[in-house]
Amino acid sequence: MIDRKLLLQDFDKVALSLKKRNHAMDDELERLCEVIVHYKKQLIELEGLQAFQNKVSKEFGIKMAQKADTSDLKKELENNKIKLNELSKSVGELEQQIDLKLSIIPNLVDEKTPLGANEEDNIEIKKILTPRVFTFKPKEHFELAQQNGWIDFEGGVKLAKSRFSVIRGFGAKIYRALIHLMLDFNEKNGFEIIYTPALVNEKMLFGTGQLPKFKEDIFKIENENLYLIPTAEVTLTNLYNDTIISVENLPIKMTAHTPCFRSEAGSAGKDTRGMIRQHQFDKVELVAITHPKESDVMQEHMLESASEILKALELPHRFVQLCSADLGFSASNTIDIEVWLPGQNCYREISSVSNTRDFQARRAKIRFKENQKNQLAHTLNGSSLAVGRTMVALMENHQQADGSIHIPKALEKYL
């Protein structure tokens, strides 16, 4: 959530940030500013009525003790209480209205994020490892998976519907091995391994920015205030929801393997075959909570941690700086890692490492204490890595002419 003080003090900065996202809201912002100003006036008036109520109540008590006439004071108290209740209700309603409107405004675009109109304006930062030159036409992962009996796509449809898969046999062993390898690498880089629930309440999804704006993308449990998590970013970040952390305990670095669930609303017709886009998938996530001065360095550290895994698996990849219009709702700056898929003859996203600055921390009330003062922390998140897409990349990059798959040395000890 953006700072309402900033909206009032530097309206143009907020408006410009939204325009950079192709999400202009000038009229809505102006109306919101008017509501905030009106709210502040009413709040001052409410505080005045409360002070008056306290003052008269004391006078009433003194006169009662003196057995003096209190009828006038009693009437004053009753009339003031009516005004107090009415104004208190109005202030509460305005507060809710402001919070709701603020909650659907995306994060401010970081100064380091380049201006762009769409994903075509994203900027390649660097490439790591050179794609292999094949002496045969490389197959796509779904062909290789079916040939080797590793993935049963029809079984997933039978059990659920499209965009679900069943992984079995040696494919399941590779899948499990990838998870173990990712967690080991992340732990080596200082991230604590944590297992969390796959269900969370509405407050947690508000904290990380999925609600209320993206309700249609999340699976909800009927008749319960519970949702299936779209990413472990939600659970790991919100472990510190409404928490004040001692500055000596920063940074907090966490990693988790979880199933993730997404409705993929708006993805009709995209990646309909294979494991690229699923309703349920596994992901190993990185989350960090840092001092504001340290979040940029942490973002680089998280990127290198994810890249280290891809290098160990001998998978060519590249870093891509997202432009302003391609940023996620909560992100201020995002760098994607894209892995080379020879079967598709292109790079595809396998990790997205985002610095949200204090945006999530303000929503989730994640603070740290320094010099006896509470301040908002910075939060970061990123995949390290998406397990299914890593398996896709492994199959396509390490396929042999006969359709068999070479196993990288780093993975052998996990099998």
Curated annotation (Swiss-Prot):
ATP binds at R262, S263, E264, E349, I350, S351, S352. InterPro entries: aa-tRNA-synt_IIb, aa-tRNA-synth_II, aa-tRNA-synth_II/BPL/LPL, Ser-tRNA-ligase_type_1, Ser-tRNA-synth_1_N, SerRS_1_N_sf, SerRS_core, tRNA-bd_arm. The keyword ATP-binding applies. It catalyses: tRNA(Ser) + L-serine + ATP = L-seryl-tRNA(Ser) + AMP + diphosphate + H(+); tRNA(Sec) + L-serine + ATP = L-seryl-tRNA(Sec) + AMP + diphosphate + H(+). It comes from the Bacteria. GO terms for cellular component: cytoplasm. GO terms for biological process: selenocysteine biosynthetic process; seryl-tRNA aminoacylation. Keywords: Aminoacyl-tRNA synthetase, ATP-binding, Cytoplasm, Ligase, Nucleotide-binding, Protein biosynthesis. Pfam families: Seryl_tRNA_N (PF02403), tRNA-synt_2b (PF00587). Its EC number is 6.1.1.11. L-serine binds at T231, A232, E233, E285, S383. Pathway: Aminoacyl-tRNA biosynthesis; selenocysteinyl-tRNA(Sec) biosynthesis; L-seryl-tRNA(Sec) from L-serine and tRNA(Sec): step 1/1. Its main location: cytoplasm. It is found in: Cytoplasm. One of its GO terms (molecular function) is ATP binding. Catalyzes the attachment of serine to tRNA(Ser). Is also able to aminoacylate tRNA(Sec) with serine, to form the misacylated tRNA L-seryl-tRNA(Sec), which will be further converted into selenocysteinyl-tRNA(Sec). HAMAP family: Ser_tRNA_synth_type1. Consists of two distinct domains, a catalytic core and a N-terminal extension that is involved in tRNA binding. Belongs to the class-II aminoacyl-tRNA synthetase family. Type-1 seryl-tRNA synthetase subfamily. Homodimer. The tRNA molecule binds across the dimer. This is Serine--tRNA ligase. It comes from Helicobacter pylori (strain G27). The gene is serS.
